[in-house]
Amino acid sequence: MFEICNPFPGRLLASAMPFGPHDLDQALWDLYRSEGVTHVLMLVSDAEARAATRQDLAALYRAHGLTVWQHPIPDFEVPQDPTAFRAMLHQVADALQDPGTTLVVHCAAGRGRTGLFLACWAQEALGLSPEAALQWVRRYIPGAVETRAQEEFVLTWPLRVLPQTP
């Protein structure tokens, strides 16, 4: 698990999926609990989570009182709806305004989709350029933003959210 420094009062973390194949020592869930995680953003679908962990992760999180948001992105791919994706970026920024928030973002390995999300979040919430956002996230998560398509999405993020002219 990686702590992502940010200027907001809340804490921002990134990780692999608990109980999944990248949670090698099966300790992430205990780490979530010891770190006081209050919010989880899942970038995996329920089906992907269930296939990897053999349980309903969203239900587990909710049963322990966590706020759960889901914005599934297929593995190694990019978001298909920039408007909904941008709304999720802002939802995370809003949640981090609360000093009692500890929010973790995860996909399967915690690198590709998680890195993509955080690099776009850094552009929206921190005002970083696309190139600086990519460097920023890779400083915290080695190997973040795994595919060329994901990298291109990050680098062209500002163009995807500009108002469209007729």
Language-model region placement:
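Cys-dependent protein tyrosine phosphatase-like superfamily
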Residues: M1-V104, L116-P166
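Conserved G/P- and acidic residue-centered "switch" motifs that form tight phosphate/ATP-binding loops
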Residues: G110
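Conserved SAM/SAH-binding loop-helix junction
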Residues: R113
